[in-house]
Amino acid sequence: MDPTDLSFSPDEINKLIETGLNTVEYFTSQQVTGTSSLGKNTIPPGVTGLLTNAAEAKIQESTNHQKGSVGGGAKPKKPRPKIAIVPADDKTVPGKPIPNPLLGLDSTPSTQTVLDLSGKTLPSGSYKGVKLAKFGKENLMTRFIEEPRENPIATSSPIDFKRGRDTGGFHRREYSIGWVGDEVKVTEWCNPSCSPITAAARRFECTCHQCPVTCSECERDT
């Protein structure tokens, strides 16, 4: 058949169709056996080397994958970079703990009051601590009623109430009740208004740079 002649006779068309059907039947009748199904022996003669090279590349890729999955199938983990942990000093700790009020505050300015429990009937056992804490709370509540304190808000500059301007920080008075034996002490100190409120007694430093160094409450602390 002349390759430049694009017309086909009925016999030539039948031969082309028969060849195509035979090729399809050949591949569909072959049993799939893993990587061997794409080897050179399964490709009929006359097919270009492009298919052969593609099949070999596919076989090699599948073989490498199987080798890498041996031993449970888990991929090896990449080593993670070690994180250097720098020990924190007092300057980087956000809240400095305040010791037991009965043992002093270690140069932390504060005011301590020893409660007079003479004439009080103290229970024994585990309920004693609850009773002592109750006495300390009653002392604080009575103090606020009988001796109202000055406004704790104090700034380093005169307050300006112009709209849109910040009035600055202030101090917040905090209290802690502690007891040893039959002795109860109430400790009070000031924290800057920008500091967090915590259940534990802690002394904080100003972080907003607007709170005053001292106020009318803490200026008499020792």
From Swiss-Prot:
Sequence similarity: Belongs to the paramyxoviruses V protein family.
Binding site for Zn(2+) 1: H171, C190, C215, C218
GO terms for MF: metal ion binding; RNA binding; ubiquitin-like ligase-substrate adaptor activity
Main function: Plays an essential role in the inhibition of host immune response. Prevents the establishment of cellular antiviral state by blocking interferon-alpha/beta (IFN-alpha/beta) production and signaling pathway. Interacts with host IFIH1/MDA5 and DHX58/LGP2 to inhibit the transduction pathway involved in the activation of IFN-beta promoter, thus protecting the virus against cell antiviral state. Efficiently blocks type I IFN signaling following infection by behaving as a substrate receptor for CUL4-DDB1 E3 ligase complex and targeting host STAT1 for proteasomal degradation.
InterPro entries noted in UniProt: Paramyx_V_Zn-bd, Soyouz_module
Species, as recorded: Parainfluenza virus 5 (strain W3)
Subunit structure: Interacts with host DDB1, STAT2 and IFIH1/MDA5. Interacts with host RIGI regulatory protein (via CARDs domain) and host TRIM25 (via SPRY domain); these interactions prevent TRIM25-mediated ubiquitination of RIG-I and disrupts downstream RIG-I signaling.
Listed GO CC annotations: host cell cytoplasm
Designated name of the protein: Non-structural protein V
Pfam families in the cross-refs: Soyouz_module (PF14313), zf-Paramyx-P (PF13008)
Binding site for Zn(2+) 2: C194, C206, C208, C211
Disordered, as annotated region: 61-107
Keyword list, A-Z: Host cytoplasm, Host-virus interaction, Inhibition of host innate immune response by virus, Inhibition of host interferon signaling pathway by virus, Inhibition of host MDA5 by virus, Inhibition of host RLR pathway by virus, Inhibition of host STAT1 by virus, Interferon antiviral system evasion, Metal-binding, RNA-binding, Ubl conjugation pathway, Viral immunoevasion, Zinc
Subcellular location field: Host cytoplasm
Swiss-Prot/TrEMBL GO biological process terms: symbiont-mediated suppression of host cytoplasmic pattern recognition receptor signaling pathway via inhibition of MDA-5 activity; symbiont-mediated suppression of host JAK-STAT cascade via inhibition of STAT1 activity; symbiont-mediated suppression of host JAK-STAT cascade via inhibition of STAT2 activity; symbiont-mediated suppression of host type I interferon-mediated signaling pathway
